[in-house]
């Protein structure tokens, strides 16, 4: 009866291994470049990571640029027209435009500067001077209606294209994947499980691609992240009395470029507007405020908008959360002085330290130990048994507890995480550190004589005198006064008194005043003999 179950589990493990191997071949590890990858995907307007990978592969294998329409080289007149458009923009705006991405039309590219000015260009677009109309300012209402209609149309086309690409990708992935070798004993249940796993994998990939932390809502014609910004509106400065506004007749600026721009009159010079406002001091303040709010270019070149600062300040204030008030809650059991800042911690303390205090007892009659927690009791019970479940992977030695295994493993790894804070001694276990600290405690108890200058302690007063003469020689004359000697009875005289015969005198630290001085000399007789004589 056990053989069919074993065969089923073996087949299940084999199927899982094949599925994992197939999935591992499809995975690509980006490492620390995930953020750049997601930003590139959003910048190019792709919704799936596989679309971006296919685009990069096509661009690498193709001989020409993928963004261009066809492998044919760009005509010279088309490049000249692009240079002309860039030159026209440079006359009106000092910012350098950059390639934003493909436009709405086939083969159309869109350039945009930091001020929001855009212009489109097609390689096949070569206008003649007769076809180029003169530049005429468009009204704000026509621009807004045209932009809204064009954006709605492009969004609808982008959604249809995205849906078509997703369906095609799923079909190709299902077609390319090799079918698993189905065993007739497996049955239809495993086939259903495989289909469900494939569907879950596809849904997970879509969720990961859509719910990445760097995703933004993007439109097909706008490859930049959808940042809320005010709609560009034309800024037309009124000429002075008797002044005729200049119209560049020799520079061909097509209507397609003016229509593709979100703001037709935004190509007018923002710098010239600022210079005009600075020259004319009679302009009211309200007009200056309206023009600075309407023109996006003036916002980019001038000082930051105060309204934006107020908005950001309000957002920052909203995000600041008030710190919760911490209440001091002492334990009300007699004899316990513990204080807690959280009600949950207090209840936990009462439950396991007072109410159910050591309710878990050891089942061994000779032991009689009790514990507050059940896990501590389980670890203790292992000490009474011969079970050694924790085995060292280096030497195959077994242990009863995991803590003993961790300490033993440090012998093989050479790790010594515990360190003495006094001398820097390192060890592997806490018992060795406690034994080492006893030496410092005994030594500190033996050092009874401190130095009054630096606080260093010594075992003998002579060591204090030698230390003072060596480390603090400049402070010794101050301490040789009688008042200072009487005020510090714990320290002997800095220098021992020398007799003419070479006898040295040293002050004793005994409590009795009688033997306060002692005379020691190897070649001189005792002091009592000299007194009698």
UniProtKB/Swiss-Prot annotation:
Give the residue spans that cross the bilayer: none
Looking at the keywords, is Nucleus present? yes
**Post-translational modification, briefly?**
Phosphorylation at Ser-471 results in loss of DNA-binding activity.
Question: Could you tell me which PROSITE patterns the record lists for this protein?
Answer: ZINC_FINGER_C2H2_1 (PS00028), ZINC_FINGER_C2H2_2 (PS50157)
Chain intervals annotated as zinc finger (C2H2-type): 329-354, 360-384, 390-412, 418-440, 449-472
Q: Which GO terms describe its molecular function?
A: DNA-binding transcription repressor activity, RNA polymerase II-specific; RNA polymerase II cis-regulatory region sequence-specific DNA binding; zinc ion binding
Q: Which residues carry this modification: Phosphoserine?
A: 233, 471
Instruction: Quote the SUPFAM superfamilies the UniProt record gives.
Output: beta-beta-alpha zinc fingers
Name the residue ranges with Acidic residues bias.
Answer: 190-208
Q: In its UniProt record, which GO terms are filed under biological process?
A: negative regulation of transcription by RNA polymerase II; regulation of gluconeogenesis; regulation of transcription by RNA polymerase II
The entry's cellular-component GO terms read: nucleolus; nucleoplasm; nucleus
Stated role: May act as an transcriptional repressor for PCK1 gene expression, in turns may participate in the hepatic gluconeogenesis regulation through the activated AMPK signaling pathway.
- Protein name per UniProt: Zinc finger protein 692
What gene does the UniProt entry assign to this protein? Answer: Znf692
